[in-house]
Design a protein with these regions (language model features):
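Acidic/histidine-rich catalytic cores of soluble enzymes
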Residues: 133-230
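A short, acidic, amphipathic alpha-helical segment used as a generic capping/interface helix at domain edges
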Residues: 228-241
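Hydrophobic faces of well-ordered beta-strands that scaffold small-molecule active sites
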Residues: 4-9, 33-35, 58-63, 93-95, ...
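N-terminal pre-domain/capping segments
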Residues: 1-91, 269-278
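Acidic-and-aromatic substrate-binding clefts and catalytic sites of carbohydrate-active enzymes
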Residues: 10-17, 32-47, 65-76, 101-104, ...
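Conserved, mostly hydrophobic/aromatic
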Residues: 25, 33, 51, 85, ...
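Alpha-helix-loop-beta-strand connector modules within alpha/beta enzyme cores
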Residues: 50-64, 124-127, 131, 158-164, ...
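Active-site acidic/histidine proton-transfer and metal-coordination neighborhood
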Residues: 39, 71-169, 261-262
Length: 278
């Protein structure tokens, strides 16, 4: 059985030397980071070499959040994303922030409209076409709203899987799938051919995170270290192995009681103990 490799996303320590942080994360047992080094000080080639010498890989890069149609029409931005992807030897980049998750930046229940979703989908298709000409794919990072919001009885997630160019892959966040009221293991089986990467996230409450508003820190709760919440983490890791995924990317939007390094250590050990992560 081929095991998953552990990676992380976020867990930034802005007041610390990033290289010392990366070295410590590698020492825990992590092999990669979802995010790139593009904006770091220093020479990009040397930075990447240093990162790789720590035994770490750049797993993914973000392309755009927001208006897809505007992004698709900006040839300079498209070229920059392609350059970045090629530099890190990535076959896909990530997008997020369509209208259905508007509640995170406004108020609970503000999930856009059907027409706004169709606008988003049109833009996504345009981006996929332009990136595809250069051999770069597009991944979409989900939250819970794609599963709770429906139009004419069809969930937003099903619209994304059927109305968007089938080259679209999911950067599937299993925790948010669960918050959306869907069994993440069952959904992974359903969408197994459309999953590009896995974000492994745990929650101790299913309802509270739905009311998150970015501008209100008191609402950023419900997240917890892997294995201490209610998401079937072991089942998700097992299914990840079964469907041929390479990475288990740990994400926790807000710390609960642990420091970032304590959390990453505990999460890694929980995944390794499952037997599905090396």
């Amino acid at each position: 059985m081929s095991k998953l490799k552990a990676a992380w996303v976020g867990f930034r320590q802005p007041d610390a030397d990033p290289w010392k942080v990366y070295e410590r994360y590698a020492a825990i047992g992590y092999h990669g980071m979802d995010g790139d080094l593009w904006e770091m000080e220093g020479d990009r080639v040397e930075n990447l070499k240093h990162f790789n010498d720590l035994g770490l890989e750049v797993v993914s890069s973000w392309a755009v959040r927001g208006d897809m149609k505007e992004f698709a029409a900006d040839d300079q931005k498209i070229a920059e994303v392609i350059e970045r992807a090629h530099f890190y030897n990535l076959d896909a980049v990530t997008m997020g922030g369509i209208s259905v998750i508007s509640s995170f930046n406004s108020y609970y229940g503000n999930n856009g409209t059907y027409d706004e979703l169709m606008y988003d989908i049109e833009g996504m298709n345009a981006v996929i076409e332009k990136l595809g000409r250069e051999g770069i794919g597009l991944m979409y990072h989900n939250h819970y709203q794609e599963f709770t919001v429906s139009y004419d009885g069809v969930s937003v997630m099903d619209y994304l899987l059927t109305d968007v160019d089938r080259r679209l892959k999911l950067k599937l966040d299993v925790g948010w799938v669960w918050v959306g009221g869907v069994d993440p293991v069952a959904f992974m089986e359903k969408a197994k051919d459309r999953i590009g990467l896995l974000h492994i996230k745990d929650f101790y409450d299913q309802e509270i995170p739905r009311h998150l508003v970015n501008q209100k820190p008191e609402t950023r709760i419900g997240f917890t270290m892997l294995g201490t919440g209610k998401v079937d983490i072991q089942g998700c890791l097992k299914k990840g192995v079964e469907i041929g995924q390479k990475w288990a990317i740990v994400e926790q939007d807000t710390m609960r009681n642990l420091t970032m390094e304590e959390d990453l250590t505990g999460s890694f050990l929980a995944m390794k103990e499952s037997g599905y992560v090396e």
